[in-house]
Amino acid sequence: MKIQMLKAIVATTTLAALGLGATAANAATATATARAKILRQITLTNTSDLQFGIIVTGVAASTVAVSTAGVVTCGAGLVCSGTTTAAGFTIGGTTGQVTTISVPASVTLTNVALNTMSASLLASAATTTLVANAGSFTVGGTLSVGASQPDGDYTGTFTATVNYQ
């Protein structure tokens, strides 16, 4: 009886071992590669402000436009003088990477008496490719000057945003 029980244990152990071996024969392996691309943190620096210059108003509403190249166009009924510039920005980042540029559609300029004017904004490019870890763009705009616009120094701020594409 002991011999039969011993034979049964050996047979069961052998079958179990054979079963485990059969599973291992059906196994497969594959390898994968882990990758990461590190980009420099983007920096954005304002190098010049959008300057519409000195404007003498008339009795009718008109506009003053400063192109992205800084060229001024003075609307009918206005007298324009002084320095005009497009806003300038420099971008720092990783060479060869494309960046997207966005600016708000407009900015409100306000004087100390809380009188306002609105200027539409336009960036010189929607994207730029960084060369030697750098790029740049400008922002021009068209200022809407009201009829007999109250005098004063008007200012407003806007935020330009740059991201990797």
Task: Spell out what each predicted region is.
Residues 19-21, 122, 158-159:
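Alpha-helix boundary/interfacial micro-motifs
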Residues 1-12:
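Bacterial N-terminal signal peptides that target proteins for export
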Residues 15-26:
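C-terminal segment of classical bacterial N-terminal signal peptides
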Residues 102-126:
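Surface-exposed binding patches on compact interaction domains or structured appendages
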Residues 4, 15, 128-129:
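Generic detector of short alpha-helix boundary/capping microenvironments
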Residues 26-101, 127-165:
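N-terminal small/polar-rich segments of proteins
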